[in-house]
Amino acid sequence: MNKDGIKNLTVVEAERELEWLAKEIARHDVLYNRDDQPEISDAEYDALRRRNAEIEALFPELIRVDSPSHKIGAAISEKFEKSVHAQPMLSLDNAFSAEDVYEFVERIRRFLRLPETQVLEITAEPKIDGLSLSLRYEKGRLVRAATRGDGTVGENVTANARTIADIPQVLQGDFPDVIEVRGEVYMGREDFQALNISQQEKGKLTFANPRNAAAGSLRQLDSRITASRKLQFFAYACGEVSEIFAESQMEMMTKLKEYGFVINPLTKVFKTVEDIISYYRDIEERRYSLNYDIDGIVYKVNDLMLQKRLGFVSRSPRWAIAHKFPAEKAMALLEDIDIQVGRTGALTPVARLTPITIGGVVVTNASLHNEDYIKGIGHKGEPIREGRDIRIGDTVIIQRAGDVIPQVVDIVLEKRQKDSSAFVFPDLCPACGSHAVREVGEAVRRCTGGLICPAQAIERIRHFVARNAFDIEGLGKKQVEFFFHAQDEALCIHTPADIFTLERRQEKSLIRLENIEGFGTVSVRKLYDAINARREIPLSRFLFALGIRHVGEVNARRLARAYQTYTAFETAAMEALMPCKQDNKEGNEAWMELTNIEGIGPQVGSAIVDFYQEAHNREVLAVLLEEITPLDEVPIMTASSPIAEKIIVFTGTLAHMSRDEAKALAERLGAKTSGSLSKKTDLLVAGPGAGSKLTKAQEFGVQVIDEEAWMRLIKGHNI
């Protein structure tokens, strides 16, 4: 990202940066809203959005279709049924200073043409750091609860919402026939601390903060887990209502309280900007005495008719704004830098600090982000902290941004020890000793150990047995964790080959699996049968199961079609030599063949070559291949195929086969499949519940057929 002033950007630079910002913000939206695993602080995220908005303001002709200024939240998880919001759940614009708040009020006055003498009432309430939820009531009964999702479609979490005591199942008093109540699900600080203690005692993962704990608890597939987590709910607004039941925001809140909802008692109405700024400062001072996390104050125009007149701008209402609290800072001594290995192999540096207190919380660790952040120079050569690097022994400035993730933001150069030396980031994984590499254009260094890295092992095994890989029934998350942590050699599963030797090892063991709680003779027999049924597997599924970075289902199918046998693929991966810019060498023939496959390219090719260059991975694969056989890919017969070279999209529910099977079959017959519909799509196969894709197809003039017509189309070609 160009750090220079926006006014100095050329059109080309602005266009490139807007493209980068769109992708980067979308990535962080997914991490925060869907995965509950943010990588950056709220302040850093807000800075990205501000930068995007400022560039768009200066170059309006460059505003992209996928601009973050038009989008809310992130795509929803596939774990839950989709739920369409009757009215969009919008996000709020942010204010970061008193000047921003004055400007917000002035914009409203200008838009409404209000004279200075007319009082404009504003409500103010703490901005809860939790998970937004929409509750739909019909005839006074809760019928649906949905997360924000992308603002239009959320996740249906009704069963879990019913377990939250603050959410009434039946409304009280005189209420509209239909009412959607919006609010925030959160976890109190004391309950959060108790939950993490319980998780530690059970040997389970702990949560980084109350917001992640609340989001993770609400998104459980087992509502009994949600019920045990002590979630709470503050109502703060309404979506769709069948009749008007209040004239002001404050009256609405009072009514919601009468209906049985919990309303934040700190919500107040003010008549001047000076008063709401005073309220902001008061709450900021008191925030750590509250039993829940807040990251600012939300201001709303009190008059609901004025709210309606003001309307919305893109992704947010004109009549509301979030005044964010600044991040708090303190100085600490950097005692050490630890390198942690994440589930995907990412090496993440963590600062170990002398204990300090920020905002009432003792901080001993802080984020250092990545290798470049420590060096003080970005991967594109741009300076970070004006080029100052971070060293062990430095006095560093710690920021607890967004009340969530402490991070090192700068150093006090005057206090640096004279004999200090620059930190050398490891190029070997501290968990397994494999090479840790950086892809071109990425700031993260990743372990290539893959199948043998203990830091990644459980997730790798889970991926290996997943539905679209080996699809071994009876090896779910709990079972994989049990076998991985088993102390007995006859029970442990640390590598994929261990799955297929389990039955043989058990035959010689005194500790029998069927005698262990949670298993039994019947279930163990079913598990062995499920394992043995996968000793032969299609090549594409095998390649996907290996978990090579960037080799998802689509690329695995492309590679299988290109090489047709595992031996040919492995030989190509072993022989491929990547280009070397330093020596001015081009890639060899095997490299060119690999990277010229449609959709593969240098990035995917590099990941494949790195994977096979690790001796550990080759050793694990050799043992695995003694137990299983990847089946040769049958060549595509396109000459007589009625769908060869066509772009096909599947939507809705199919009765004769799953959508994944239908996609695989279409590709075997020479078609290209896509998850999204465009004007280039040739055919939409629509089952029941097709939804928006069906409407789009009609708009674009795309041919639409049902499943029966699809079956007739491919009859006789099913290879």
UniProtKB/Swiss-Prot annotation:
Binding annotation for NAD(+): 42-46, 91-92, 125, 148, 184, 300, 324
SMART domains listed in its UniProt record: BRCT, HhH1, LIGANc
GO biological process: DNA repair; DNA replication
Lineage: superkingdom: Bacteria
Gene: ligA
E.C. number: 6.5.1.2
Matches recorded under InterPro entries: BRCT_dom, BRCT_dom_sf, DisA/LigA_HHH, DNA_ligase, DNA_ligase_AS, DNA_ligase_CS, DNAligase_adenylation, DNAligase_N
GO terms for MF: DNA binding; DNA ligase (NAD+) activity; metal ion binding
UniProt: Zn(2+) binding residues: 429, 432, 447, 453
Protein name (record): DNA ligase
Enzyme class at the top of the EC tree: ligase
Domain BRCT: 638-719
Reported function: DNA ligase that catalyzes the formation of phosphodiester linkages between 5'-phosphoryl and 3'-hydroxyl groups in double-stranded DNA using NAD as a coenzyme and as the energy source for the reaction. It is essential for DNA replication and repair of damaged DNA.
Active site: 127
Protein family membership: Belongs to the NAD-dependent DNA ligase family. LigA subfamily.
Swiss-Prot/TrEMBL catalytic activity: NAD(+) + (deoxyribonucleotide)n-3'-hydroxyl + 5'-phospho-(deoxyribonucleotide)m = (deoxyribonucleotide)n+m + AMP + beta-nicotinamide D-nucleotide
Disulfide bonds: none
Keywords for the protein's UniProt record, in alphabetical order: DNA damage, DNA repair, DNA replication, Ligase, Magnesium, Manganese, Metal-binding, NAD, Zinc
